[in-house]
């Protein structure tokens, strides 16, 4: 919503990074453009294993791990404990002096990680070889890593050991692929790009960024040449001023392609979590509502709120939450890279391990609905998600139907239907239903196999034939109308994304022209007709409040109950949302169009809309 310049809009724009500037028709392609094109030529072959895997382990471990989110006894509440040096403004020398003696990896730590990842159904793992503090879990021979006057040296493996090698060997011994995260940002190197952090070493004269880029290239070459075949190099941290050639991206990509031609690389040599200058995008702690069409992508997420070990963050995700997160991401065509933050000895916190063990039990039964699948053919399903393989459709049922009828908005011949984890020989009845407008109805048992997500496997003759998209009430009776399901018509009106990492939200905004409309296709199935109470989650700056709006359904409704009118209240700002009751509407069985329109606009804009919810009283 345009109220001068808003932080939410700025953050949203920062998350969209352009590709390298296209050359004029008369100019030869740049080296960067040519290198990206070479990567694209082999992408499908290199990404085949990654698209099959769908689920991997992220591991944040380093000198920040002993601190656990504390410094000198003070608790730092910020979520990312691996940033403790920044939060506490600790000089590099002091940070190294205190943390190095406390980082004491136990023998066999990597075997325990690999067992946990394998048993959870993960297929690959990525370890922080160097995080922002600049310390290396691999034994680098770069002169600055061997010895330097600031931190004494960046290598932190115990004498006679190489922690990165232990990680890679253990993962491969369990059948997982190993890859490395590498931070382009460096808080200790005197020639690194400087951020506004008190911890940065002050150096006389200007920094020589070319020296730092050579240092980065040396590190990457060591990882590529010394640790066997790697699944990925997971670069981190580009922004508006440090991205692309600021990191020497063309040479780095050429090195990767030359040394390990089968490797895949993420997109963070360039700015923006969803930019296309890599093999896969990297949304962080959020799931794009419609996936990222036209590109591969991987959500990296955490089991609590922090990536690095935090002794005070007990906000652990349970198994059900992770199972649904995985189901959601894979149904939209993405991968999940799920993080653990081991302590200074390499031990995984028990709540995290317990959750992963639970996920592993679910994957033993349902892994075929995750590994090797592609995105759902449906725009949205009221009761859950779906994935597919050739000739097979997997229905991920989050909300079990109380009447024993799972309604699927598709046509096509179903050869067989069964519930994974139930009785393997027990077939489920599945047939189109006239009462449901020709939609497929699968007769399911009275209770689910797993309340978080049960999988119904349909074997098909040919491809599923999704019916025209309609939003139906979920099994609990709620009808949710969201921004990404709407058709927006009119100048300027659009879907806004607010936030970059973590708490990313979307809303309909920039409603500058009162002639604009938002329309949703709604379906009311058999036994779902009746009165629905309507509630809108909306926001409006105080100075712009007072627009008159209508929410109406196309069709004949007795007594005019198909239309509701209301006045947009002041909520305190364009991103300060309130739930506002609009009244009740009667909806008969059938297909309808729900239309939200403005009738007047006294201020700069009409309203921001996060959702409309209809439910029976």
Residue locations for each model-derived region?
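Extracellular beta-strand-rich recognition modules
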Residues: 534-536, 582, 592-598
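Short, conserved beta-strand segments of beta-strand-rich sandwich/propeller modules, principally
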Residues: 453-455, 531-533, 591-593
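Short beta-strand and strand-turn-strand segments in soluble, beta-rich domains
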Residues: 574-576
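Signal peptide processing junction and immediate N-terminal pro/mature segment
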Residues: 19-26
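Bacterial N-terminal signal peptides
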Residues: 8-19
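Acidic/polar, compositionally biased interaction segments
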Residues: 579
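Mature catalytic domains of secreted/periplasmic carbohydrate-active enzymes
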Residues: 26-526, 541-555, 559-572, 584-586, ...
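Bacterial N-terminal signal peptides that target proteins for export
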Residues: 1-9
């Amino acid at each position: 919503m345009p109220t001068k310049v808003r932080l939410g809009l700025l953050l949203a724009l920062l998350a969209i990074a352009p590709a390298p500037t296209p050359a004029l028709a008369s100019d030869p392609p740049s080296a960067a453009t040519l290198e990206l094109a070479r990567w694209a030529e082999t992408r499908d072959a290199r990404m085949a294993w990654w698209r099959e895997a769908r689920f991997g382990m992220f591991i944040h471990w380093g000198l920040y791990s002993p601190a656990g989110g504390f410094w000198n006894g003070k608790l730092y509440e910020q979520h990312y404990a691996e940033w403790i040096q920044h939060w506490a403004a600790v000089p590099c020398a002091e940070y190294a002096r205190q943390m190095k003696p406390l980082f004491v990896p136990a023998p066999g730590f990597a075997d325990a990680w690999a067992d946990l990842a394998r048993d959870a159904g993960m297929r690959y793992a990525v370890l922080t070889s160097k995080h922002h503090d600049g310390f290396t879990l691999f034994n680098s021979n770069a002169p600055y890593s061997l010895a330097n006057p600031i931190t004494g040296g960046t290598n932190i493996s115990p004498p006679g050991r190489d922690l990165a090698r232990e990680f890679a060997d253990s993962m491969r011994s369990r059948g997982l692929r190993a890859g490395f995260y590498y931070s382009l940002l460096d808080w200790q190197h005197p020639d690194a790009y400087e951020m506004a952090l008190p911890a940065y070493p002050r150096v006389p004269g200007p920094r020589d960024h070319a020296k730092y880029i050579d240092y980065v290239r040396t590190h990457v070459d060591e990882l590529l040449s010394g640790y066997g075949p790697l699944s990925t190099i997971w670069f981190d941290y580009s922004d508006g001023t440090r991205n692309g050639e600021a990191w020497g991206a063309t040479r780095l990509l050429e090195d990767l392609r030359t040394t390990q031609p089968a490797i895949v690389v993420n997109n963070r040599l360039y700015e923006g979590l969803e930019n296309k200058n890599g093999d896969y995008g990297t949304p962080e702690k959020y799931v794009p509502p419609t996936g990222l069409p036209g590109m591969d992508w991987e959500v990296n997420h955490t089991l609590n709120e922090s990536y690095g070990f935090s002794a005070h963050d007990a906000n652990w995700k349970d198994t059900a939450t992770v199972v649904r997160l995985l189901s959601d991401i894979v149904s939209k065509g993405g991968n999940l890279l799920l993080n653990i933050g081991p302590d200074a000895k390499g031990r995984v916190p028990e709540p995290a391990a317990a959750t992963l063990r639970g996920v592993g039990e679910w994957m033993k039964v349902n892994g075929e609905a995750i590994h090797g699948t592609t995105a759902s053919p449906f725009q949205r399903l009221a009761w859950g998600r779906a994935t597919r393989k050739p000739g097979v459709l997997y229905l991920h049922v989050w909300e079990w139907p109380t009447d024993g009828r799972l309604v699927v908005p598709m046509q096509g011949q179903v050869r067989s239907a069964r519930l994974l984890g139930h009785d393997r020989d027990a077939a489920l009845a599945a047939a189109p239903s006239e009462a449901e407008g020709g939609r497929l109805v699968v007769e399911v048992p009275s209770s689910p196999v797993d309340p978080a997500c049960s999988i119904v496997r349909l074997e098909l003759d040919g491809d599923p034939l999704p019916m025209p998209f309609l939003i139906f009430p979920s099994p609990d009776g709620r009808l949710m109308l969201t921004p990404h399901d709407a058709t927006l018509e009119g100048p300027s009106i659009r879907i806004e994304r607010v936030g970059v990492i973590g708490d990313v939200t979307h809303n309909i905004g920039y409603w500058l022209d009162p002639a604009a409309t938002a329309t949703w296709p709604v379906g009311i199935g058999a036994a779902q007709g009746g009165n629905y109470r309507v509630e809108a989650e909306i926001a409006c700056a105080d100075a712009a409040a007072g627009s008159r709006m209508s929410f109406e359904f196309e069709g004949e409704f007795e007594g005019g109950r198909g239309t509701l009118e209301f006045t947009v209240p002041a909520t305190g700002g364009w991103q300060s949302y309130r739930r506002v009751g609009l009244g009740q509407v009667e909806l008969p069985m059938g297909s309808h169009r729900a239309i939200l329109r403005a009738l007047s606009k006294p201020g700069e804009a009409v309203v921001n809309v996060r959702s409309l919810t209809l439910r029976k009283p």
